[in-house]
Regions:
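Predominantly soluble domains enriched in secretory-pathway, periplasmic, or organellar proteins
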Residues: 1-351
Length: 351
C-alpha cells in the first residue's frame, strides 16, 4: 500500500486540504490544515517534510508538517507572497512578493527573511534549476521571465543573488507560472492572456511559441520521461499535451471547470488538476466531453487510459472533493521519511 498524500491549496477557505492516496482510485480526505488568508500556489516541501505555502492576503509563509498535518509557524516576507521555490539542500526558500514587486530570500534554519531583491511588477510563480544555480520567475505585470543567479546560496551568500536576464514574453501575455522540463534544457511558461505557451531555451534564453488557441494558461507539468508537457487552460477546461521535442500540440484532454494547478503522479501516471471555478462560467467547446465535475474539486485523469500522441479515445476520471477555491495541487510521499521519525512527530503533536 502506498503512503502518498495530495495537498490542495484552497484559497477561499484559507486551508490546505490533505487527501490520502493509498492506491489506484483510492482517495480520502484526511485533514484540512488552517493556514493564513488567501493561500496561493502549491505547497513546496523539503525532503524532510517541511511544507511552505504563501498567504497572499498577508505577508507570511505558513510552514506545515507533512506528517503531523498541522501549521508549525508563519514566517514574514514581503507583501502579497504568491509563489515560492526551495533550493537544493533545503536551506533556503525564494518567495515572489506580488505586492512588493520583489523576491525574498528566507533562511529555513533561522526561519527569517534575509533580504529582498527588486523585481518587475507583480511577480508570480517560479522554478529553480535542479543544480541550484538559476531561478526563473514569471513577472506577470511586465510580461517577462526574470532569470536570477542564485548559485551564491550554495555557500550561504545571499548578497550574491542577482538578476542576470529579463527574458521577454509579451507585456500583454501575463506569464503566470512555469516549469523546467526534466532534461533541464527548456522552460515552459503558461500565459494567462495569450493563446500560446512560451518555451525558453535555457542555453540561449531564446523563446518559442506553442499555439494552444485559447487564453487562460495556468499550470505546467511533465511526464516522467520528459516526452510530454501538460498545460492547463482555465478558460476552456482543458489540458493541452505538447511534444517537448517537436513543440507541437498532440492533443487536448477535457477536465473539470477552471483548471489551474496540476501534478503528475509518475508512479501510476495519473494527473491531478485543481478545479478553481467558483461557478459554472467556463466556456466549454462543443466537441469536448468534459467530466460532469463541480468546482472546488480535483480532477484525477488516468493518463494511460487514452493516447497522448493523437486526439483519439476518452480518458478515465475521478472527482475528489476539497475546499473552496482550489488553485494548486502537489503530492508528497510519506515513505521518504523514516517510519520512526514519522511516529515521533505525531507523538509530539498529540502530547
Amino acid at each position: 500500500m502506498r503512503n502518498v498524500q495530495i495537498f490542495s491549496t484552497d484559497t477561499d477557505d484559507g486551508v490546505v486540504s490533505v487527501v490520502a492516496k493509498t492506491g489506484p482510485g483510492e482517495h480520502r480526505q484526511v485533514k484540512q490544515i488552517r493556514v493564513g488568508n488567501a493561500p496561493r500556489g502549491g505547497v513546496k516541501f523539503t525532503k524532510g517534510g517541511r511544507g511552505f505555502v504563501c498567504n497572499t492576503s498577508q505577508n507570511t509563509l505558513s510552514e506545515i508538517d507533512a506528517v503531523a498535518l498541522t501549521e508549525v509557524r508563519r514566517i514574514e516576507v514581503g507583501h502579497g507572497p504568491r509563489g515560492l521555490g526551495i533550493l537544493p539542500g533545503d536551506r533556503y526558500v525564494l518567495v515572489s512578493n506580488s505586492g512588493s514587486d520583489s523576491l525574498s530570500i528566507v533562511d529555513l534554519e533561522l526561519n527569517v527573511e534575509l533580504r529582498q531583491i527588486p523585481l518587475g511588477r507583480d511577480p508570480r510563480h517560479m522554478m529553480i534549476s535542479s543544480d541550484g544555480a538559476w531561478a526563473y520567475v514569471c513577472v506577470w505585470g511586465d510580461g517577462y521571465v526574470s532569470k536570477l543567479d542564485v548559485s551564491g546560496l550554495k555557500n550561504g551568500d545571499a548578497a550574491a543573488v542577482h538578476e542576470v536576464a529579463q527574458i521577454p514574453v509579451d507585456r500583454e501575455a501575463h506569464p503566470y507560472s512555469l516549469n523546467i522540463d526534466p532534461s533541464g534544457r527548456r522552460v515552459f511558461v503558461a500565459n494567462t492572456q495569450a493563446t500560446y505557451v512560451t518555451v525558453i531555451d535555457v542555453a540561449t534564453n531564446e523563446t518559442h511559441r506553442v499555439d494552444v488557441g485559447y487564453i487562460g494558461g495556468r499550470g505546467v507539468a511533465f511526464s516522467e520521461d520528459g516526452k510530454y508537457a501538460f498545460i492547463t487552460v482555465e478558460t476552456v477546461a482543458r489540458i493541452y499535451v505538447v511534444d517537448v521535442e517537436t513543440l507541437e500540440v498532440t492533443r487536448h484532454i477535457p477536465v473539470g471547470p477552471g483548471p489551474r494547478g496540476l501534478v503528475v503522479d509518475h508512479n501510476d501516471f495519473t494527473a491531478y488538476i485543481s478545479n478553481f471555478a467558483r461557478a459554472s462560467v467556463i466556456s466549454l467547446p462543443e466537441e469536448d466531453k468534459n467530466p460532469a465535475f463541480g468546482p472546488n474539486t480535483l480532477t484525477m485523469v488516468d493518463l494511460k487510459s487514452a493516447p497522448l500522441d493523437r486526439q483519439e479515445g476518452e480518458f478515465e476520471y475521478e472527482e475528489i472533493f476539497v475546499g473552496y477555491g482550489p488553485c494548486s495541487v502537489v503530492m508528497f510521499d510519506l515513505d521518504t521519511i523514516p517510519e520512526e521519525e514519522r511516529l515521533n512527530r505525531v507523538d509530539r503533536v498529540e502530547a
